Amino acid sequence: MKVIGILPFKNEEKFLPTYLSNVQPICDEIIAVDDHSTDNSRQIMEDAGVIVKGYEDTEKLKGGWTCGLIRQHLFNYAREAGGTHFVCLDADETFTSNFVPIARDIMSQLEPGEKVHMQWLALWKSYTAYRDDHTVWSRNFKDFIVADHPDLDYSYNYMCEGRTIGPNNNDTLRTLEVEHGGVLHYQFACFNNFL
């Protein structure tokens, strides 16, 4: 089993140290695409040993540049590097601390094409509270890890529609309850940034 983290990023320097400290213990390698960052993001990633592809590496794609194409090319790079399992978090996300020690064991149990489906915990106006109020921001589950299968590809157009390659259905999703792990989303933790 070779676990590769894949990450599209742009101007994420404030989140990358936390992302890296959380994901590196799980992954054998991380491959990222930098979409024209103007901050120190690329340097942070390279200093951490991440393989960073620039936008120019995939600029010659036919059909324009979309988030789906970025993700598909990240999967292609990860496959070329021998990846069998892929971790698909964004830079402003981390796994909960209870998941990190069991992550590789859970991944090793996945059949090709199976995914780990976890609760997406939207931190709300703080780093200590997440929304649990029966809105779109609570009880929201997403796929963040997939065991590769050669027939899978990424066919979505937007990042928010899916992270991993292949279809999401009852046959492919292995859902974890938050007692076993979740994903913390930091975008709204610093709510004053949006005011």
Name every feature range the model reports, one short phrase each:
Residues 64-75, 96-195:
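Catalytic-site signature of metal-activated, phosphate-bearing donor transferases
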Residues 11-26:
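Short, well-formed alpha-helical segments that are part of the catalytic scaffolds
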Residues 27, 83, 111-113:
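Short, high-confidence coil segments that cap the C-terminus of an alpha-helix
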Residues 46-69, 73-81:
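Conserved donor nucleotide-binding strand/loop of the catalytic core
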Residues 7-9, 34:
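Short beta-strand/turn micro-motifs composed of small residues
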Residues 2-4:
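Cell-envelope/extracellular polymer assembly enzymes that use nucleotide-activated donors
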Residues 33-45, 57-59:
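A conserved acidic beta->alpha catalytic loop
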Residues 82-96:
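Short beta-strand-to-loop acidic/aromatic patch adjacent to the donor-nucleotide binding site
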